[in-house]
Amino acid sequence: MAEVLTIEELRTRIDVIDEQLVRLLNVRVACAVEVGRLKHEAGMPIYQPEREAQVLKRVRESATALAGPLTAEAVVRIFERVIDEARRAEREASQRRDRLDINIGE
């Protein structure tokens, strides 16, 4: 027989999952910032639409294969937002590096 959880138990479970999601999102964005640093050093643009399309295709395929309560389209929308925030963090880090380069050069 399946375990019946109370609302509070389910909310506690959700809180734990939320904390894990925040931790993983921060790790993901930290990786993106490092990729941005490497792209900056190589003189490459931060925004690379082909890579974004690749990530969203992979995410859509994963969401379809896992077939959870979220549709593949919903998962893609979530990841579009995650990617936007990662790109913003990359730009901010790049601007800080540029300011540091200017200050060091003076």
Model feature map: region roles:
Residues 1-106:
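Domain-level signature for soluble enzymes in the chorismate/prephenate branch of the shikimate pathway
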